[in-house]
């Protein structure tokens, strides 16, 4: 674990579902912020004990950049009782339109965070692009309707899930993960308002921390 700035931490852990055919590194990144009152865990996996201990006397919460980045969220909710901010998972209709599968194959939609949204485990706080979370986080649209890029004003940090990722060629918007009919330029356009913000940290969950100049290169 490394403290990037006062109240801002980064660590990595091996993703349990990783396969050698994946374009991303097995070790993925998670982040935490602590302003003395509120502790936020972003896409948490393998949370260090030092961070977990802070949850006892903080208003703690988990923030997912995408529902499929739930990682250790359920385990943390069951042990710490923290709420989870998350975008909604893919609907059955979206899966059929996007991947050309049948209604039977699509079922009830993506099973991401089903434990949270349908099984009553934990408190879900659903958000979407354009929302300002009461946790002090603003959500910007990513490469899919439920894959967000987050602005944390108190730490002057941008946290990205799959939209801005390091896949061997530097941090970038990866064409491989774009939805049907979505172009790289469209994604970049939706994120350019970030260039007007005082960004000091660009925090990728696939690729780790980067300098703010990288964001300008990617979005210009």
Question: What residues fall within each predicted segment?
Answer:
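Residues that act as N-cap/strand-start positions at coil-to-secondary-structure junctions
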Residues: 25-27, 121, 127, 144
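Active-site HxH/HxHxD metal-binding segment of metal-dependent hydrolases
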Residues: 46-129
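Residue-level marker for well-ordered alpha-helical positions
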Residues: 27, 70-71, 188
């Amino acid at each position: 674990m490394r403290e990037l700035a006062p109240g801002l931490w980064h660590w990595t852990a091996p993703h349990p579902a990783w396969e050698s055919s994946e374009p991303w590194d097995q070790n993925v990144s998670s982040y935490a912020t602590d302003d003395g009152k509120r502790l936020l865990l972003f896409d948490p996996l393998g949370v260090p004990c030092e961070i977990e201990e802070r949850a006892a006397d903080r208003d703690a919460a988990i923030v997912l950049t995408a529902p499929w980045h739930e990682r250790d969220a359920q385990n943390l909710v069951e042990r710490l009782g923290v709420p989870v901010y998350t975008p909604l998972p893919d609907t059955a209709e979206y899966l059929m339109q996007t991947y050309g599968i049948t209604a039977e194959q699509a079922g009830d939609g993506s099973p991401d965070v089903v434990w949270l949204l349908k099984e009553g485990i934990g408190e879900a706080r659903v958000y979407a692009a354009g929302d300002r979370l009461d946790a002090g986080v603003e959500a910007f649209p990513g490469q899919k309707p439920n894959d967000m890029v987050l602005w944390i004003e108190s730490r002057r940090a941008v946290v990205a899930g799959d939209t801005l990722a390091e896949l061997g060629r530097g941090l970038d918007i990866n064409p491989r993960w774009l939805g049907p009919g979505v172009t790289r330029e469209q994604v970049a356009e939706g994120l350019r308002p970030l260039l007007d913000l005082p960004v000091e940290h660009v925090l990728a969950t696939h690729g780790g921390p980067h300098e703010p100049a990288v964001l300008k290169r990617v979005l210009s």
